[in-house]
Curated annotation (Swiss-Prot):
One of its GO terms (biological process) is macrophage chemotaxis. It comes from Macaca fascicularis (Crab-eating macaque). It is found in: Secreted. Keywords: Secreted, Signal. Modulates injury-induced and chemical pain hypersensitivity. Ligand of FPR1, can chemoattract macrophages, promote phagocytosis and increase ROS release. Belongs to the TAFA family. One of its GO terms (molecular function) is receptor ligand activity. GO terms for cellular component: extracellular space. It comes from the Eukaryota. This is Chemokine-like protein TAFA-4. InterPro entries: Chemokine-like_TAFA, TAFA_chemokine-like.
Length: 140
């Protein structure tokens, strides 16, 4: 049989274990919450690495001629002298002079093996391979 003093000591140890466990659980929850918020980003506060771009929205549809139309919204954090562009069919930061002068093919927008041609009105470019042609028109 245990003495009242031993019972009080056991209760105290048990209580301190529960308090410690609750504290560890709270710390873990805060760390997990902070890391998931960092991955998701805060609306309006999300920072991306300088010199990179990320797609924030994609839109896709077909017109009446069964031609697929795609558009995307991109968020970039470019270095000074750079602007949002396209390299190897992915959003990227490119030299501003390429965009200003509309030398679209100088940013290498097409995939490996595709030919790049600037559209006649300089509004974008086309990438072609065999009988497949992808046309990109720049909008701001």
């Amino acid at each position: 049989m245990r003495s009242p003093r031993m019972r009080a000591c056991a209760k105290s140890v048990l209580l301190s274990h529960w308090v410690f466990l609750a504290y560890v659980l709270m710390v873990c929850c805060k760390l997990m919450s902070a890391s998931s918020q960092h991955l998701r980003g805060h609306a309006g506060h999300h920072q991306i690495k300088q010199g990179t771009c990320e797609v924030v929205a994609v839109h896709r549809c077909c017109n009446k001629n069964r031609i697929e139309e795609r558009s995307q919204t991109v968020k970039c954090s470019c270095f000074p002298g750079q602007v949002a562009g396209t390299t190897r069919a992915q959003p990227s930061c490119v030299e501003a002079s390429i965009v200003i002068q509309k030398w679209w093919c100088h940013m290498n927008p097409c995939l490996e093996g595709e030919d790049c041609k600037v559209l006649p009105d300089y509004s974008g470019w086309s990438c072609s391979s065999g009988n497949k042609v992808k046309t990109t028109k720049v909008t701001r």
